[in-house]
């Protein structure tokens, strides 16, 4: 959520920055709401002053024996009380309308974010590693994976399209990847591992920005009988739960940064993705991801963003996977992000790079919703900055390992860093 004080003091400048990311901020509507709010507040203050003044007179009038005048004054106070209740209701209505609108407004892009309308205008930062040149006709991860235990038909039979069953060697490799990622982040990068719920309420999703704007992308869960029925949601990412661990809290500054990680399934309806990536693991309704979240001092957040990108890169380097880093342009950034880097891994069968990690600095956008604060050196409570990043998407990493490390006979070489998590197995072979 944007800072309302910033909106009030720099409306035109905020509107201009939002326009950079394709959002048309209605300044006339904002001005109208602000005028209504100010009018009600002025009326409330005038009524309160009048009530206080008349209340002081009542005692004096009674002391002078002027009972009729005292009663008239008491009647005035009673009417003012009624008027104040109405003014409070009017102010609450204006504030609710303003708050609901603010929840739908995206974050302001950082000044360093390149301008652009969509993904075609993202900017490449660097490429790392050289895509392998194969001397045989390569297969995609579907043809490689099915003989090793990747079962798309089984997933569809159980749950419908975009679900997958893994068994045997593929299931073990998938698990090994997640464990390797967690160990790297906790033992080398200093994150604390968490296990968090996979089902959350709407307040939790509102805190990180998925609600109210992106309800159609979420899986709903209903529980209870007719009288106690409640709606909750399957998490689309562990960013939601990890970031919400600091909601409604004041963190001592010496405890910052907080570095949190979790391995979880992620559930997404993929609304609007009909017809995209219908083959294989690239776009699933359920997939695993190892998430990184950092809660930091505001002055450290952009330094931290670069650090988190490096943490995700370390996984790709260890797995010997070619990749590139791109800066998302203003028109392609996520709703809550002020700046985002995507890491894209080379997928040989598609002859292109595909997103495998997204690392974002949300600045204080989420923290304002969450009331996540820290106490600075002067004893003042300030909003923290929150950052999140994939470290990495496990299914897409599996795709990359299968395709980049394949052999002509359909076997898969296991990267050396991953072999301890595979019981020393150096190659997956069709049995």
From Swiss-Prot:
A GO MF term: serine-tRNA ligase activity
Pfam families registered for this protein in UniProt: Seryl_tRNA_N, tRNA-synt_2b
Residue numbers binding ATP: 268-270, 355-358
Signal peptide: none
Pathway as given in its UniProt record: Aminoacyl-tRNA biosynthesis; selenocysteinyl-tRNA(Sec) biosynthesis; L-seryl-tRNA(Sec) from L-serine and tRNA(Sec): step 1/1
Chief place where the protein resides: cytoplasm
GO annotation, biological process: selenocysteine biosynthetic process; seryl-tRNA aminoacylation
Record's keyword terms, sorted: Aminoacyl-tRNA synthetase, ATP-binding, Cytoplasm, Ligase, Nucleotide-binding, Protein biosynthesis
Enzyme Commission (EC) number: 6.1.1.11
GO cellular component: cytoplasm
The protein's enzyme class: ligase
Annotated compartments: Cytoplasm
Binding residues for L-serine: 237-239, 291, 390
Domain comment in the entry: Consists of two distinct domains, a catalytic core and a N-terminal extension that is involved in tRNA binding.
Protein function: Catalyzes the attachment of serine to tRNA(Ser). Is also able to aminoacylate tRNA(Sec) with serine, to form the misacylated tRNA L-seryl-tRNA(Sec), which will be further converted into selenocysteinyl-tRNA(Sec).
Family: Belongs to the class-II aminoacyl-tRNA synthetase family. Type-1 seryl-tRNA synthetase subfamily.
Protein name: Serine--tRNA ligase
Source taxonomy: Bacteria, Pseudomonadati, Pseudomonadota, Betaproteobacteria, Neisseriales
């Amino acid at each position: 959520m944007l800072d309302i004080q910033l909106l009030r003091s720099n409306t035109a400048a905020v509107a201009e920055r939002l326009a950079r990311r394709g959002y048309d901020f209605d300044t006339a509507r904002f001005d109208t709401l602000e005028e209504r709010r100010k009018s009600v507040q002025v009326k409330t203050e005038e009524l309160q002053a009048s009530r206080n003044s008349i209340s002081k007179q009542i005692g004096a009038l009674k002391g002078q024996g002027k009972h009729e005048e005292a009663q008239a004054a008491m009647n005035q106070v009673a009417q003012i009380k009624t008027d104040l209740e109405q003014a409070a209701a009017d102010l609450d209505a204006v504030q609710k309308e303003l708050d609901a609108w603010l929840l739908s407004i995206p974050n302001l892009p950082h000044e360093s974010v390149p301008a652009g309308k969509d993904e075609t205008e993202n900017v490449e930062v660097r490429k790392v590693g050289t895509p392998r040149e194969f001397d045989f006709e390569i297969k995609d991860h579907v043809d490689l994976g099915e003989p090793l235990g990747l079962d798309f038909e089984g997933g569809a039979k159980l749950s419908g399209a975009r679900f997958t069953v893994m068994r045997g060697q593929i299931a073990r490799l998938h698990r090994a990847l997640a464990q390797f990622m967690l160990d790297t982040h906790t033992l080398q990068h200093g994150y604390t591992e968490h296990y968090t719920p996979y089902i959350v309420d709407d307040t939790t999703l509102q805190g990180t920005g998925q609600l109210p704007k992106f309800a159609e992308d979420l899986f709903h869960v209903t529980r209870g009988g007719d009288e106690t029925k409640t709606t909750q949601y399957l998490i689309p990412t562990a960013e939601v739960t990890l970031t919400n661990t600091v909601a409604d809290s004041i963190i001592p500054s010496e405890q910052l940064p907080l570095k949190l990680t979790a391995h979880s399934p992620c559930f997404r309806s993929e609304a609007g993705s009909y017809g995209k990536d219908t083959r294989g693991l690239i776009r699933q309704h359920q997939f695993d991801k190892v998430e990184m979240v950092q809660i930091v001092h505001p002055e450290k957040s952009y330094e931290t963003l670069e650090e988190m990108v490096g943490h995700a890169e370390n996984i790709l380097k260890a797995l010997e996977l070619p990749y590139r880093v791109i800066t998302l342009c203003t028109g392609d950034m996520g709703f809550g992000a002020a700046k985002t880097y995507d890491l894209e891994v080379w997928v040989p069968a598609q002859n292109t790079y595909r997103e495998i990690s997204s690392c974002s600095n949300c600045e204080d956008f989420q923290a304002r919703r969450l009331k996540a604060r820290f106490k600075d050196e002067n004893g003042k409570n300030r909003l923290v900055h929150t950052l999140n990043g994939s470290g990495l998407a496990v299914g897409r990493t599996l795709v990359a390992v299968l395709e980049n490390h394949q052999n002509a006979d359909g076997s898969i070489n296991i990267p050396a860093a991953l072999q301890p998590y595979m019981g020393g197995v150096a190659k997956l072979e069709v049995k």
